[in-house]
Amino acid sequence: MSFNLRGAVLANVSGNSQDQLQETIVDAIQSGEEKMLPGLGVLFEVIWKNADENEKHEMLGTLEQGLKK
């Protein structure tokens, strides 16, 4: 039996408003549950694929700074 996690996550949030997406992200981060990490990864993949080069550079800078803390 094969389970498509990426597809399940995308189906679960497809059509959500910005507020709903923010709630999903904040809830996943605040819960601190390891099982939420793959879903956050799928959401980041969507962001990355839809970002232009400047946005990607900005995200990488933010990530780099966050990892230095």
Curated annotation (Swiss-Prot):
Pfam families: SSPI. Induction: Expressed only in the forespore compartment of sporulating cells. Coiled coil: none annotated. The keyword Membrane does not apply. Keywords: Sporulation. InterPro entries: SspI. It comes from the Bacteria. It is found in: Spore core. Its main location: other. GO terms for biological process: asexual sporulation; sporulation resulting in formation of a cellular spore. Belongs to the SspI family. This is Small, acid-soluble spore protein I. It comes from Bacillus mycoides (strain KBAB4). The gene is sspI.
